[in-house]
Amino acid sequence: QEGGRLLESWESENRYATRYISRVTDRLNLEASNALFAELVEEMHRRGMRVILDGVFNHCGSFNKWMDRERIYERQPGYEPGAFISADSPYRSFFKFHNEHEWPYNPFYDGWWGHDTLPKLNYEDSPKLEEYILRIAAKWVSPPYNVDGWRLDVAADLGFSQEYNHEFWRKFRKAVKEANPDAIILAEHYGDASGWLRGDQWDTVMNYDAFMEPLTWFFTGMEKHSDNYQPGMLGNARCFVDAMRYHMASFLAPSLQTAMNELSNHDHSRFLTRTNHLVGRVNHLGSEAASGNIHPEVMREAVVMQMTWPGAPTLYYGDEAGVCGFTDPDNRRTYPWGHEDQQ
């Protein structure tokens, strides 16, 4: 309503908040415009920053208009019926249903890892879906948005066969690189990714095997979810070196040099919490336990290695400010504005 102008740096104080309260409560402002997003990316580029979007192409939410299990769009004007609602839905082929006699409101569809809130997308039976997603891949790395790449959620799970998975990512890479040759394609992946890192699919990966896991065991003796503590792994240089040599050998040099090297992220306990060697999760231990008996000096040592190891050192927001937390959702706490741990 005010023109969609970005906040200036000097407007970050609380006394300016009332000027913008209508922006986030007015119905017309609930969804930012594409034009504002393009402006945001342009400003970030001007400041020497780059923007990578999170692409979740393996599944969608059950509330997505394509499925509409929660029946949000069923009676809204301008929306076609979701695949859950009707067998005649234009999105029916986007999903794999297993009982053809349950419409309307058919709950028998494939969900990612069995989660009915995360319907798995059925590319093999829907050229329309594949074409749409490939257009999306190119759209956001192209003018006027000029995003700098994609982070691909559970990328190896996409499709219902490995053959199709590799075929799709080859098409995805072609679409992205033709639109923006400098855009990076970064995949979330656990295990050996060499089959995708041959120059025709992904550029690199979130580096669990050749960074996060070996460092976590060496510095803390903890599994990355804080689900297990192995004292024999703490400070075990032989295990650390052997693991690094083994997993780094599966990378070609360009992928290794750009791999996303994290100590913490949104799926695992905070590294600082792992330094207390406390096994468990927030629902059993409580959130306060995550910050008990921590060892910041251990994290500082790990950060030195993170910043000097081959790859792209990647900070998870709040790690630099001493944020603690057990695994998801406790690891997604609010940033401690004004209360950062400066040490």
What is the predicted function of each stretch?
Residues 1-144, 172, 178, 195, ...:
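Substrate-binding/active-site clefts of carbohydrate-active enzymes
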Residues 118, 136-143, 147-176, 192-213:
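Conserved N-terminal glycine/acidic-rich loop preference
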Residues 246, 337-343:
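Aromatic- and carboxylate-lined catalytic core of secreted/periplasmic carbohydrate-active enzymes
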